[in-house]
């Protein structure tokens, strides 16, 4: 997100005041720095003036250490990550200074208890920028850059951040086998290699470890693992056969194939936020409660995912939603990100409101607005200066539109896929304007239906010392 360079927080805590004095002493002396990568390896740097070095300058040192060309400068960004919070740094951020303010950021953007905050320490990661268009990835020629992107995508698959169907994660696991173990092993050697590295190195944790339960206990985990190994070996053999030609078996081709497969997941490249939503009221007492969700935001749209069940609850392109965030009005209230979208209730078209409770609502709202701006700029550039649409933007026929609509509706009804939205399982506020018809928000819903309808899309800065891009 963008922001001004004002003081953050308005009233600095005693901890931050005691720490900031050490920043000046770090300006001249050489210091060791560990920058972690998605595969848990680290780049060890010894740098002078670390205290006043911004992320852009630090990026040059990391790219040099990794032999990454400067042409890939926009692909990656620095992130501060911990179990409590993830933040993407802007090029002008001072990582050393921001690290000293970490506890202040946790108090502002998380509900973590004081004890957890006092013990939390972020790691500095070098990984994909949320603002890098996925279409550009497959144009990258450098194998080192593609391998870094592969490592990060694989991590998100294994950790369940990118929900996908069994046939999808099995194919991705087979591609990982081909990339990491090679394509020349016979079935016996491949099975032995998979067992040595363990299934959890290739398949999502919830798939490799199983969900447990009575039937799982009767069957035995060993038998289930053997079956999964056989399926993985079979799929790997299929992948290797389809890549039988020499060039297709090269690592760079397999890396591209893995990333291309990940691009089929709409939430690839998202920044992720923690939040909660209301559960639908159930039972005689209409008790609901809340459900933990992960909110992914990218250049493409917003995706709300069930943390426990590893599936999508709601996926919306920016053209399909309006949004806003609200601050607590009284003690005990929550920060809320509001999402508005079209839906149906008992066959009647309605507007639906989804409330996402999160202290990161302000960050989410700002990131959505910034992504909308970036898309608007890129679409304007693609339209041409004379106002004529390019071939890719030519109007489509009504027949094409109808087919597209039918295909989209069919996909949404395929609820056995974890990728499809489950709007029926959400507890939303439904309304119809004047009780008769929906007042559709145009153009492209690029402004909030609460406060921005009369204004063109603009980006509202979040007032912090170091403006934050959130992930």
Curated annotation (Swiss-Prot):
Q: Where in the cell is it found?
A: Cytoplasm, Cytosol; Cell membrane
InterPro entries the UniProt entry points to: Band_41_domain, FERM/acyl-CoA-bd_prot_sf, FERM_2, FERM_central, FERM_domain, KRIT1/FRMD8, PH-like_dom_sf
Q: Classify the main location.
A: cytoplasm
> Which keywords does this Swiss-Prot/TrEMBL entry list?
Cell membrane, Cytoplasm, Membrane
Tell me where on the tree of life, at the top rank, the source sits. Answer: Eukaryota
> Which SMART domains does the protein's record reference?
B41
What cellular component terms from Gene Ontology apply here?
Answer: cytoskeleton; cytosol; plasma membrane
Pfam families from the UniProt entry: FERM_M, KRIT1_FRMD8_FERM_C
The biological processes this protein is annotated with in GO are: anterior/posterior pattern specification; negative regulation of canonical Wnt signaling pathway; negative regulation of Wnt signaling pathway; regulation of canonical Wnt signaling pathway
Q: Where is this region: Disordered?
A: 1-23, 381-416, 451-471
Q: Which residues form the FERM domain?
A: 31-382
Please give the function described in this protein's UniProt entry: Promotes the cell surface stability of rhomboid 5 homologs and prevents their degradation via the endolysosomal pathway. By acting on rhomboid 5 homologs, involved in ADAM17-mediated ligand shedding. Negatively regulates the Wnt/beta-catenin signaling pathway.
Q: What is this protein called?
A: FERM domain-containing protein 8
What is the organism field in this record?
Answer: Danio rerio (Zebrafish)
Q: Which gene encodes it?
A: frmd8
